[in-house]
């Protein structure tokens, strides 16, 4: 195999390797996929203001997330059904995250159970949660995550209904017959019904609670002592409500551009959320991160860290655990280089003054 020199190269290799239905499920966005492209392109419009003649012989990328020390501000986002990409699926991802000294977030809709992932490797892990119509299912899932040593809940709040993913409709996407949503196997909810469009869309419509509201965020705090990250915040208004609801943190996310098309890129929403958060809780970002330079830009705009999704899936498909390890190492190396060339020796030294955004350029043009 030709030497892989950046994260994005894994996607083309994964496209060649995976069945079309599975590649399309991982790669596609909602409707026209404008937001899918914008998640990447918005990063390219942010430029650097590097500082020079600073001793960068030693660089420290370590950080703390919700009280847990990790090696770098790059973590793994929840991505469903990873055994479609590789036979070891989430177990390989967990081992790679552990080796890198960072956090993995396990999807509710994983093809490995919370118990299996806990046994795969030591490490700090978060559990992503959808709220089901049957709240007893939610209680059981949260309890199992607690017993399996998970350290936080990432509550997905942008999916009262599944976005219109036309590739999945064309492919009549369904979980391959040899796989099951392991966390739901004992509840007889581990399989999706065959339909004329997307099996996942039908599953969400039948199981996920459309009435989910901010009162449920408070309810969740009554059934667990784990900190709750609200995943899917994109506005100041919802940031204010997240703070008021007692959330421990926010993940600025548009669900990988898979829900509502024509929403802004997450990097374009980040500053609005950070400004409203006012340091009362940490703000994280996912969506479109493919380079260490992207990580630096997010940190400069106020993020406490980033989560990556598709790069993990594509590298997992190509080379299993070793692929995920390589993606994490490449992003780490690129971030370290960006810090050195920008004159930063620690994450605390990365400031808003290190980047120029579209809004900066507009402001300057009016002066």
From Swiss-Prot:
Residues reported to bind glyoxylate: 25, 130, 165, 255, 258
Pfam families linked: FMN_dh
CDD domains noted in UniProt: alpha_hydroxyacid_oxid_FMN
Enzyme class: oxidoreductase
One record GO biological process: regulation of photosynthesis
Active site, UniProt feature: 255 (proton acceptor)
Record's protein name: Glycolate oxidase 3
Record organism: Oryza sativa subsp. japonica (Rice)
């Amino acid at each position: 195999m030709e030497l892989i020199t950046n994260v994005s190269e894994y996607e083309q290799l994964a496209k060649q390797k995976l069945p079309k239905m599975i590649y399309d499920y991982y790669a596609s966005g909602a409707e026209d996929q404008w937001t899918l492209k914008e998640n990447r392109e918005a990063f390219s419009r942010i430029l650097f203001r590097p500082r020079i003649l600073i001793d960068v012989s030693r660089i420290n990328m370590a950080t703390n997330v919700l009280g847990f020390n990790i090696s770098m501000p790059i973590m793994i986002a929840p991505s469903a059904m990873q055994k479609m990409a590789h036979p070891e699926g989430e177990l390989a991802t967990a081992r790679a995250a552990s080796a890198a000294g960072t956090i993995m977030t396990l999807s509710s809709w994983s093809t490995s159970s919370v118990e299996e992932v806990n046994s795969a490797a030591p490490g700090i892990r978060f559990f992503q949660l959808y709220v089901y119509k049957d709240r007893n299912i939610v209680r059981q899932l949260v309890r199992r995550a607690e017993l399996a040593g998970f350290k936080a809940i990432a509550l997905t709040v942008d999916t009262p209904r599944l976005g219109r993913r036309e590739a999945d409709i064309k492919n009549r996407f369904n979980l391959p017959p040899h796989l099951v949503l392991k966390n739901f196997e004992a509840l007889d909810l581990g399989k999706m019904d065959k339909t004329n469009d997307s099996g996942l869309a039908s599953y969400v419509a039948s199981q996920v609670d459309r009435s989910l509201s901010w009162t449920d965020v408070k309810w969740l705090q009554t059934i667990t002592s784990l900190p709750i990250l609200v995943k899917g915040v994109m506005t100041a208004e919802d940031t204010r409500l997240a703070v008021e609801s007692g959330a421990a943190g926010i993940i600025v996310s548009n669900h990988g551009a898979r829900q509502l098309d024509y929403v802004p890129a997450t990097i374009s929403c980040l500053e609005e959320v950070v400004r409203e958060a006012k340091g009362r809780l940490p703000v994280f970002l996912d969506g479109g991160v493919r380079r260490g330079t992207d990580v630096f830009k997010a940190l400069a705009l106020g993020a406490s860290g980033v989560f990556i999704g598709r790069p993990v899936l594509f590298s997992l498909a190509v080379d299993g655990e070793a692929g995920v390890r390589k993606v994490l190492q490449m992003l780490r190396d690129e971030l370290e280089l960006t810090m050195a060339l920008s004159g930063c020796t620690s994450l605390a030294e990365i400031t808003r003054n290190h980047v120029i955004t579209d809004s900066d350029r507009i402001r300057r043009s009016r002066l």
